[in-house]
Amino acid sequence: MRRGLISRSKAELPDAVLDTRLARVRAAMDAAGLDAFLLYTNNTRAAGVSWLTGFVPYWSEALLVVPRDREPVLVAALSYRVKSWIERTSRLAEVIHGPRIGFEAASMIAARKADATVGIADLDGLAAGIVEDLRRGGPRLSLSDATALFAPLRAEADPAEVALAMRAAAIAQHALAQTPGRGASLGESIAAIEAQARTDGAEEVYVAAAPDLDRDRRLRRIEGEAALGESFALRATVAYKGTWIRLTRTFPRDGAVHPQEAAVARLAAAVAKLPSSDGFADFRPGWSRAAGSRSRSSR
């Protein structure tokens, strides 16, 4: 369940952007001969529906129905009491509520064309119960997987999507910078990261940790307290208006910043162990063999 603020900003996601995306989907539908296109969403799989409508569910699940000749309709398992909230935070022609979203979506499509051709993104990943309800709600509907139709449309991000990703990254970066430092426990560091991310507008934030990098570099969710090694890592996974970003930083337990020279020395030692047939043995920190001149390291 998402616990942060879910809102819509027309400045960040204008109607014109959604119109352009929808037009691209409809053009692909026409080329594939589809009468309708379905996208599934829940609080962990919000990206596709959010990309077309701006809608991000805080809980439960829904199906977005995109007819070839009408505006998108959301069939949601959320109760009717959140109808006005859904309408405020997304751009939809209509919201239909019902516990059996597959049956409701299929019935709506079949009412206009009983033998409609329906493409479904990630059909194999759709719950069996929803697929069965789609067949019950529209026995004559022709259902097929349309993942290959939808995926290329999102392969290249538009400026609005890039801007949302940059905002999410800024939230994650700012949050990771709030770790208390010397003497702080792991729990205090995680709490500081989560608090800052939510203050900055994150819809959701998950923090994972590798408490002792010398022993185990795997990042995991921490329950309770864990002893810190000489260095540890924290990863912030942040959602902002349907866009997810994940950033990881490593930290020394004592709060000191390790000199860049130490990192360069470790790199040089590692490179010295490589085969020298291509000249690796001649590597010296701060020098570029290919350029034949001294190069400055970027900070």
Annotate each language-model stretch with its function.
Residues M1-R299:
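Active-site neighborhoods and metal-handling regions in enzymes and metal-associated proteins
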